[in-house]
Every structure is written in structure tokens, then in C-alpha cells.
Amino acid sequence: MNKRYPIGELTLPDHATAAANRTEYLKNIGELPALVAKLAAELQSRNLLDVPYRAGGWTARQVIHHLADSHLHAYLRHKRTLTETHPTLTPYDEASWAELTDVTAVPVAASLEILRGLHLRWATLLATCSDAEWERTAFHAGSGITYRLDTLAATYSWHGLHHVGHLRLVLQ
């Protein structure tokens, strides 16, 4: 198994596949907070929050806080795609964010609370999108990729499960 990509690398779906799998993406986005909370509780009970998932990788604590940071960005990217004409989405330095004191000194419970509320709003928003809204586009300045809303949802559906895979590696 590739520990960096425990569920495999992201492959962006074509438009037809993304459209056909919207329900799956919504399910994954909606269920992620409970899954991460369950894993976090086990990691905490076994005193493993500060163990990296692989040599040179983030600790479980960093992964959990990263999910909150990244998915806040994701939610805002989805909202911008729904409300602006082909917005430009900007990257951020996630590796540097993972070293800041709000990651190293704050209990993971804070990020679990963020994920619960955020994913409820995000899944609710996406569940009400029309076909035309799912086809709205945004340009990601860091990757140079133009995303449709459904391919953006596919990306973050994968992203959550990707990091769940990292948390499971720590528990092994």
C-alpha cells in the first residue's frame, strides 16, 4: 500500500461520471465528520494523536486540523462557484498551516466541531443544487484546472476519504 495515497491518487472524473456520482459525493461529504470523530476518539484513547501516518508525514492531529482548514476552503470554493461567474480559486500553503499553533496547541475537538457544522451546511447546500448549478465552473489558480461544481465535490469527497485512510494507518 502507498501510505501517502492509501485510497489511491485522485483521478478527476469526466463530466458524465461526476454527474452520475453526485449522490455518492454528497454522502461522503455528509458522513465525514462522524467518521473522523470516531477515529479521533480511538486515536486519543490510544494516545496516538501525535504519531505521523508515515515517515515524514503529518501527525493524526495535523491531519484532523488540516481537514477543518481544507474543507473550510472547499465550502467557500463551492459557494463562490455557485454565486460568481467562473471565479478564480486561490491555493494556500497547507504545509505551513499545519505547523501553526492553532494546529499544534488546540485540541482536535475544536476542528471536529468545525467539521460537524461545516459539513452539515455544505451537504445541505449541495443537496439543493440544480443540474445547471452542478455544471457551474471555477478556475483553480494553483493547479490550472477548471472545475465544474460536481468535479469539485468529487475532489473533496476523495480528499476526506484520503485523510481517513491516513488516520487508519496511524491506528494500525
Language model segments and positions:
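Acidic/histidine-rich alpha-helical segments that form the ligand environment
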Residues: 28-41, 98-136, 156
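Terminal targeting/low-complexity segments that flank the catalytic cores of oxidoreductases
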Residues: 1-31
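A short small-residue
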Residues: 9-16, 95-103, 142
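Short, contiguous alpha-helical
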Residues: 1-7, 49-95, 120-123, 135-172
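Solvent-exposed interaction patches of small proteins and small membrane subunits
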Residues: 17-27, 52, 84, 105-106, ...
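A structural signal for long alpha-helical coiled-coils and helix-turn connectors
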Residues: 40, 44, 82, 130, ...
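Short, contiguous, helix-prone interaction/anchoring segments in small proteins
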Residues: 19-54
